[in-house]
């Protein structure tokens, strides 16, 4: 199989409580897979610094399980951790996952929309199980990242045209 040519590589982090579906969202988007017997991956809580995890990230998904109110109530802490350790220009989307369990909903859409609007976040609800809005959520995030990168490069190019010497970083961020 021939290698694909890549123009940009963006580091995107997925944050949220354990078992909200972060790994399943990633698997659904990258491989179009979903595992019914998936085990919750243990990542972290808020107790220790995650600065290395955020280094170089240009996008983030804050994921909660729309059937577990507590996972939504922890989103402000995840957002604070992100804002402390990540680049100030990071693009963030709030994801309410598991819409396939609508009859078990404990987080009203209005609550999540209000929070996202107040914090300046994008917002979508998804289901990794049936693939609802998964591609749309990643594409929304990646499109906004791409737009920011292009604006930043345009500004740098404009500045460098008026300077005699300019050093520009390449327009991509290496994945880690």
Curated annotation (Swiss-Prot):
Q: Which domain of life is it from?
A: Eukaryota
Q: Name one GO molecular function term.
A: GTPase activity
Supply the Pfam families for this chain: Ras (PF00071)
What sections of the protein cross the membrane?
none
Annotated SMART domains: RAB, RAS, RHO
A single Gene Ontology CC annotation of this entry is: endosome
The UniProt family comment states:
Belongs to the small GTPase superfamily. Rab family.
Identify the NCBIfam families for this entry: small_GTP (TIGR00231)
The protein's name in its UniProt record: Putative Ras-related protein RABA4e
Recorded source organism is: Arabidopsis thaliana (Mouse-ear cress)
